[in-house]
A protein has these predicted regions:
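Canonical Rossmann dinucleotide-binding motif of NAD(H)/NADP(H)-dependent dehydrogenases/reductases
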Residues: 3-35
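Active-site-adjacent segment of SDR/Rossmann-fold oxidoreductases
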Residues: 23, 29-30, 138-141, 169-172, ...
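The beta1-alpha1 cofactor-binding region of Rossmann-like NAD(H)/NADP(H)-dependent oxidoreductases
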Residues: 54, 71-85, 114
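A short, exposed helix-loop element centered on a Lys and neighboring polar residues
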Residues: 132-133, 176
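Catalytic loop of short-chain dehydrogenase/reductase
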Residues: 146-170, 175-176, 180-184, 193-213
Length: 214
């Protein structure tokens, strides 16, 4: 275990699998105490299970790190507040927030339902706000904090992903504004634009296309 983040507390949303899991494990490896948030749903957001978050917490503890699971949805203000509250109640502070939770409801725009649009916007764009707002209350008081948001190259436009692209590009504007709002309080806010093969992005259709391309 490293010690670069010793004494720091981090929240990672959508940390049960994929990029979020890797982020949570790395933070713990560097000495941070981690709140592992994951609703445990399918890639489209349906269903829920505690096992993904629990498994990551176990991995961290098996490596002699400290972590706690949280199963709230980022799509509601109450869920976001409770995720941040979990860090305070368990570890007494918050230093790092990584907004990573996401779902997909891919469909060509002419076939996309309002419900499919709303579901993706709620988890990605609202989810970033719902966790960032209560975190910033704490960060402003302590005059320090780090926020890392998760955008995507799909924000520049991707076939069949009008909802996802809109949310991910919205996160870029949100990030820039939060950085300006919070910079005077010693808080940074940045976004990453990953291109990654994860459970969320490697759909059966994409997997079939990759196989055909071999």
């Amino acid at each position: 275990m490293g010690d670069r983040l010793k004494g720091k507390v981090a929240v990672v949303t959508g940390a049960g699998r994929g990029i979020g899991r890797a982020e949570a494990l790395l933070l713990a490896e560097e000495g941070a105490k981690v709140v592992v948030n994951d609703l445990g749903g399918a890639p489209d957001g349906s269903g829920e299970a505690t096992s993904p978050a629990d498994e990551v917490v176990k991995e961290i503890k098996d490596r002699r790190g400290e972590a706690v699971a949280n199963y709230d949805s980022v799509a509601t203000p109450e869920g976001g507040e409770n995720i941040i509250k979990t860090a305070i109640d368990t570890f007494g502070r918050l230093d790092i927030l990584i907004n990573n939770a996401g779902i997909l409801r891919d469909r060509m725009v002419f076939n996309m339902s309002p419900e499919e649009w709303d579901a993706v916007i709620k988890v990605h764009l609202y989810g970033h706000f719902n966790c960032t707002r209560p975190a910033c209350v704490i960060f402003r008081q302590q005059r320090s904090g780090r926020i890392i948001n998760t955008s995507s190259e799909a924000g520049l436009g991707n076939m069949g992903q009008a909802n996802y692209s809109a949310a991910k590009e919205g996160i870029v504007g949100f990030t820039r504004t939060v950085a300006r709002d919070m910079g005077r309080y010693g808080v940074t806010c940045n976004a990453i634009r990953p291109i990654a093969a994860t459970r969320l992005t490697v759909t059966p259709e994409l997997q079939a296309a990759l196989e055909r391309a071999k």
